[in-house]
């Protein structure tokens, strides 16, 4: 296990700089076996040194590319494939270890109606693109998004939802809540709520682009 200070969602591709000795050992073990390791969010504490508190749900990553430097550090590119749930934490030896359970998104395919999901995902994609375009106009360092192709096959729709989540770049709290949601329909509704909250924030910013400006005081009676 490689706990991190960020939420890694299924479908993500993550660059990692591995410099701490215990995680160098983890990489060496992975490179000798199936190149897979798990990650969860550090809910309290730091990535370096141990003594952290960790969430129970995370992602299973596969090392796609790896380069070891002369001083023993590693640069990795890893892809997240599936959600995992930690059943029990084991002793660090020397890196964090755990017994985990894979939580595939296709456990309940009947919970996904292809026609309904395709329409809802396409609508959410349009709203997210509008949000990002507005944020870029205000100076955010993000790329303007193109249209995301929405599949019609039931098996691909759950993965497409994760692509939309990544496009929104939600807070760690929102991303973790989505990751912990086992039911895909509930996850879609939760994500739609997160998109709406983001829209409300943007509407407030458009109405008052600089709430600290003394030339634009807030009416205390409002």
Could you describe each region identified by the protein language model?
Residues 1-222:
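N-terminal low-complexity, acidic/polar interaction/targeting segments
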């Amino acid at each position: 296990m490689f706990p991190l200070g960020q939420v890694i969602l299924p479908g993500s591709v993550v660059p990692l700089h591995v410099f701490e000795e215990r995680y160098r050992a983890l990489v060496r073990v992975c490179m000798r076996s199936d190149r897979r390791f798990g990650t969860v969010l550090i809910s309290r504490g730091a990535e370096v040194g141990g003594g952290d508190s960790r969430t129970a749900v995370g992602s299973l990553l596969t090392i796609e590319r790896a380069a070891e430097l002369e001083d023993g550090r590693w640069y990795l590119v890893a892809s997240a494939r599936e959600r995992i749930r930690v059943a029990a934490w084991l002793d660090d030896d020397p890196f964090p270890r755990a017994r985990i359970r894979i939580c595939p998104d296709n456990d309940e395919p009947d919970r996904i109606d292809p026609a309904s999901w395709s329409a809802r995902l396409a609508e959410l994609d349009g709203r997210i693109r509008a949000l990002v375009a507005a944020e870029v106009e205000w100076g955010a360092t993000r790329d303007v998004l193109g249209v995301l192709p929405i599949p019609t096959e039931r098996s691909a729709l759950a993965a497409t939802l994760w692509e939309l989540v990544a496009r929104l770049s939600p807070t760690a709290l929102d991303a973790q809540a989505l990751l912990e949601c086992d039911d895909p329909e509930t996850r879609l509704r939760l994500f739609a709520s997160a998109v709406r909250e983001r829209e409300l924030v943007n509407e407030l910013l458009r109405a008052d682009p600089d709430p600290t400006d003394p030339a634009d005081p807030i009416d205390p009676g409002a």
